[in-house]
Structures are given as structure tokens and as C-alpha cells.
Amino acid sequence: MTLSTGTLGSIASTHTLPSYLDANHLGPWGNYLQQVDRVTPYLGSLARWVETLKRPKRILVVDVPIEMDNGTIAHFEGYRVQHNLSRGPGKGGVRFHQDVTLSEVMALSAWMSIKNAAVNVPYGGAKGGIRVDPKKLSMGELERLTRRYTSEIGIIIGPS
């Protein structure tokens, strides 16, 4: 994000949008933004909410270190995205995959917001991800990874 110098008012009027709002962004998040742009003309009075749909409420990237069965310490990258919490707490699982990206987790959290709203359940949208091949971990390692990831994202999950 680029900001100019000066008063708060001039900063607010001259900043560049965060890169995650760029519909030309490659990957799942960019695809989601393009889909939102494509349906906007059909939203009528609801179109005023489009910018909200394009902005995740919170993005958390965490380092998740765990002790492996052989005694070494391995580090995994984890993500938690809370897309929208206006309908209630964020609902969404965790994707364990070696190729998961922040872009993918952002898109999945946004779709959770839309799915929950479409079926009128009192939840917002959220999603998590951990870059790991779970097939390469023992059950004990997978349990330690899950517990540590949950601990690391604890600052944004749970009762308010």
C-alpha cells in the first residue's frame, strides 16, 4: 500500500488500494473478485455492499512450529481469514494441503460468507489453511500441528 505524507485527511484521500482488492490478481482471490464484479449489475440496491464483499475483515498468517516424531522442529505456514462477521461468528474449516495459498483461503472464506447468507444461517464466513502434506505426517504429528495451529490463531477465534 502506498501512502502520501501529510495530514490524516490527505492520507485517507490519496492512498492506493491494498493489492488484495485488485481484480487482476491471479489465483482464487482474483477469480472471486472478478465474479463479484460480474454479478454487481444484477444486485440492484444490494450493490452498495459490493465493496464490503471485496474486503476481508481479518487476515492472519502464522508460523506453526511443531516437534516431529524424530525430535526435529518443523515449521508450517498457516492462514486464517475472517471475511465477514456481520451475520455472526465466522464459520469455516481448515484446509490441510501442501499447495494451499493465502489467495485460496481468502476466496474460500468469502464463499463461506455468501453460502451462510444464502441459506440464512447466523454465521459469517471464515476459512483456514495450513501448507502441509498431511499424508506425510504421523497421526501424532498431525494432532500436534492442529493443536498448535489452533493456539496460534487463538487471538482471532473463540468467544468475543
Name what the model sees in each region.
Residues 2-160:
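N-terminal ligand-binding/catalytic initiation module
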